[in-house]
C-alpha cells in the first residue's frame, strides 16, 4: 500500500494583517506625532461622520492611533492621559511654552514647569532690585527686612505669572505714552498759535467767496469787525428811513477791559477793505438776531447772503429823483424805500353817500361839467366821464357809480 500524501501545512498566521497589526507602528512615535494624533481625537466633531456608528468607528480608530495599545503598556497609556490633564491645568501661556518643548512623560513636564518658574523668578528679582525702595515700602519696619524677603511662595508665584502675562504688553504701553506725548505737544502748539486766528479770519474775509446759505450768522462774524457806537446813537445814514438804536446791554458787551470802544470799520470807495464792502456789523446778540447792518442805509439783515445782495444796490450811485414828489436821492435803495411811502399812503376819505331814491346821478353825455385834465399827479382817468384821480382806489370807487347806473 502506498503511503498517503501529506496535506500541505496551513499557515499559522493569515495572509491579511488584522486591524491591530495595520495600526501598529514598530518604531517609537515622536512627541509631535503624538500631539497631532491627540488633537485629532479631541477635536473630532460628530457632523463629519455620516452616522452614529461611523462616528464611533472613527473615534475608536483615532484613539488607537493616539494611545497605541499594541505598542504601549497600560501604565504608559495612563501616563499620556495624566500628562494631558496636567498640561490642561497649567496657565495658558505656561502651557503653550511647555507643549512647545514636547515632553514625553509627566516628570519631564513637571521639570519644564519648575525650570520656567525659576527663570521667571530670577527675572522678577532682578526687576525688583532695579526699582527704588520707596515704591515697595509702605513704612519703616523695625526688623529692617525688605518686602521681598517677606513674600510667601504663593505670592512669589503670582508675581511670576503677572510678569509673564505683562511681558508682551510693554511695547503697547510705550507706544501709548509716545502717542500721548505727541498729542500734548500738538495741543500746546495749537494754543500758542491761537492769537493768530483773527488775522487768518481777516485775510479770509478779503476773498470774494460767496458764503454758504447753511452758515450761521454767528459763525460768519469776525470778532474785531463789529461797528460799535456810543449809547443812544442811531445806526443809519442821514437820509435812510430806517434806524435802530443799540441798547446799553449790547453796548457794554462790546467794550474791552479798559472801557474803550473798539473802532468801527468804514466803507471806502475803490480801496482795500478789511471786511465785506460797506459792512457795519451790529454787536453779537442772542441766537437768531440780526447781526448784519448796512452802513449806508441802516438796513439790518439776518443772513450774509441777503446783505451782500443788498450791497450791490449801493454800487449804482447817482441822483435818483422820485417821480411822485420830486425828491432826489443818492442811492437807488433809498429811493426804493421812499417809494413805498407813496404806494402805501392811505386814500382820502370819501363823502358819505345819501341812501334813498334821490341818489346823485352822473350827468349824461352833452351835459357833462368841466373835466379835470390828466396830469402826472393824476394818472388814473375814467374812460366814461374823463375824470382823473391820483389813486387807483379812487378810480375804482368812481367806476362803481357808472356800473350801478348801467353806463358800462
UniProtKB/Swiss-Prot annotation:
Predominant location: nucleus
Any one cellular-component term (Gene Ontology): nucleus
One Pfam family cited in the UniProt record for this chain: SCAN
Cellular compartment(s): Nucleus
Domain SCAN box: from-to ranges: 38-120
Keywords: DNA-binding, Metal-binding, Nucleus, Repeat, Transcription, Transcription regulation, Zinc, Zinc-finger
InterPro entries, alphabetized: SCAN-C2H2_zinc_finger (IPR050916), SCAN_dom (IPR003309), SCAN_sf (IPR038269), Znf_C2H2_sf (IPR036236), Znf_C2H2_type (IPR013087)
Region (Disordered): 1-34, 136-155, 177-203, 215-273, 344-379
GO BP, one annotated term: regulation of transcription by RNA polymerase II
Keyword Nucleus: yes
PROSITE patterns: SCAN_BOX, ZINC_FINGER_C2H2_1, ZINC_FINGER_C2H2_2
An MF annotation (GO) of this entry: sequence-specific double-stranded DNA binding
Zinc finger (C2H2-type): 292-314, 320-342, 380-402
Biased composition annotated in UniProt, kind: Polar residues: 177-187
Annotated function: May be involved in transcriptional regulation.
Identification of the protein by name: Zinc finger and SCAN domain-containing protein 1
Organism of derivation: Homo sapiens
Taxon lineage: Eukaryota, Metazoa, Chordata, Craniata, Vertebrata
